[in-house]
């Protein structure tokens, strides 16, 4: 499309420096790299959205969202008759009585959550395999 100068407020100087270096090393421009990165990021978000929408439409999952902080116990997960998608939260805390088997059977996805806290007995890789756009997974 048409090119114009755009200012991005709040862009991390570290990210800008890395993109700038990448542009020099690859012989492209900062704009081209940012455009491609945003294009891929948006496509990823759209794909995640579509996948979750399909699961919801098929009636395969329960969605819990719009809560800033949530603590989930074994009993909470066992009460559900379908796997759950946790989305759009600052933090999600799995209580100490939650184990790997319960995560495998009852947690469909964790999407757009700042920090997920898990008991030390729960595999962080298992949590990561069910996560999209999760900033941190912290064993406690």
Region spans (language model):
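Short, positively charged interaction helices/loops
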Residues: 43-76
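Repetitive beta-strand solenoid architecture
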Residues: 66, 80, 88, 94, ...
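General marker for long, soluble alpha-helical cores
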Residues: 129-139
């Amino acid at each position: 499309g048409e090119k114009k100068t755009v200012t991005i407020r709040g862009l991390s100087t570290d990210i800008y420096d890395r993109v700038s270096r990448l542009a020099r090393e690859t012989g492209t421009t900062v704009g081209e790299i940012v455009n491609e990165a945003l294009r891929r990021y948006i496509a990823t978000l759209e794909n995640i959205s579509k996948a979750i929408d399909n699961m919801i439409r098929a009636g395969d999952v329960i969605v819990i969202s719009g809560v800033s902080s949530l603590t989930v116990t074994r009993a909470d997960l066992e009460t559900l008759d379908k796997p759950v998608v946790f989305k759009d939260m600052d933090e999600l805390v799995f209580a100490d009585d939650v184990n790997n088997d319960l995560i495998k059977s009852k947690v469909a996805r964790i999407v757009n959550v700042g920090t997920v806290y898990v008991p030390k007995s729960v595999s962080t890789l298992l949590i990561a395999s069910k996560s999209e756009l999760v900033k941190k997974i912290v064993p406690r």
